[in-house]
């Protein structure tokens, strides 16, 4: 199942409540403010702070 980009209008980072960006190549949502990446599993974003991974812009 593909991620529906319309979700970006309503989802927010669970840590800072900021905007998330879609990383299609890695199938994750990125919070640049907190430098965290949230996985997307079967089209569903896993927006749990304890499941987030550190995000590095250069990676």
Curated annotation (Swiss-Prot):
PANTHER family: PROTEIN PREY, MITOCHONDRIAL (PTHR33505:SF4), ZGC:162634 (PTHR33505)
Protein name as annotated: UPF0434 protein Shew_1640
Matches recorded under InterPro entries: Trm112-like
Membrane-spanning segments: none
GO cellular component, one term: cytosol
Top-rank taxon, per record: Bacteria
Organism (species): Shewanella loihica (strain ATCC BAA-1088 / PV-4)
Record-stated family: Belongs to the UPF0434 family.
């Amino acid at each position: 199942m593909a991620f529906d980009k319309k979700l970006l209008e309503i989802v927010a980072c669970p840590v800072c409540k900021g905007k998330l960006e879609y990383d299609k190549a890695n199938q994750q949502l990125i919070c640049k403010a907190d430098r965290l990446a949230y996985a997307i599993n079967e089209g569903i974003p896993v927006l749990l702070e304890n499941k987030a991974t550190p995000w590095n812009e250069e990676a």
